[in-house]
Amino acid sequence: KNDSFNRYISKEKNIQFLVNQGQLHWDKRVNIKDANLAKLFLSKANNLNPDNQEIVELYARACHFVGYYIESNPDRSDSLFIEGMNATWSFIISTNEFQEGAALFEGDSTEKNIAGIANVSEEIVPILYWWVSNYSRFLAKKPVMDRLQSRDLIETVLHRILSLKPDFFYHGANRLFGGIYARLPGVELSLSMNNFDKAILGSPNYLGTYVVRAEY
């Protein structure tokens, strides 16, 4: 019993060390080396404890940050976005709320996923946000058909965020809707602009929305 307890304590200390190092480097992420080290430490912490929401959230955010702002190689950026997607999605589908929602719906896997997302609680909004942030960045330069196939699930996640916590990350769901709709064929550009406007109205001092809008 003592050996098992000691191993548990050792693992917990190791996780806490990795998280502390990840947070330390994340706080200095304006430096490229620190941003990459933050992602590295947080990935190791997440591997040891994939059920810790705070670790998953910061890890996925670091994946998005390095993939979007730092990495210049498209394939490596995609790998980072996929890392963030996988970590957050694994967490989402493990929640009781998701599983209960999915279990009540008889249909294919996509429909079950949509039903599960529609049932999740406000507590995991940050996880939803960093999942969809990584996924939408991954899809941004993919063929139109790939983006259309993912549309229903992505829209469900964004609508769930808007219904639970619309101001999360400087009205991030509206900002993401703006970018996604700007790239989808058959969608009125005004729908994209309306979402960018809502994000700016809600968080006028967040420059990221202006930057994303300028891309389109």
Each predicted region: which residue ranges?
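Contiguous, well-ordered alpha-helical segments that form the cores/surfaces of helical PPI scaffolds
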Residues: 61-62, 133, 175-182, 215
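Secondary-structure transition/capping residues
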Residues: 33, 102, 188-189, 210
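Short, hydrophobic/aromatic alpha-helical segments in well-folded domains
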Residues: 41, 157-160, 176-177, 181, ...
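Amphipathic, non-transmembrane alpha-helical secondary structure
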Residues: 36, 82, 197, 213-215
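Outer membrane beta-barrel transmembrane domains
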Residues: 195, 203-208, 215-216
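Alpha-solenoid helical repeat scaffolds
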Residues: 57-58, 129, 172-176, 207-213
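N-terminal alpha-helical interaction modules that lie
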Residues: 1-167, 202
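Alpha-helical adaptor scaffolds
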Residues: 166-203
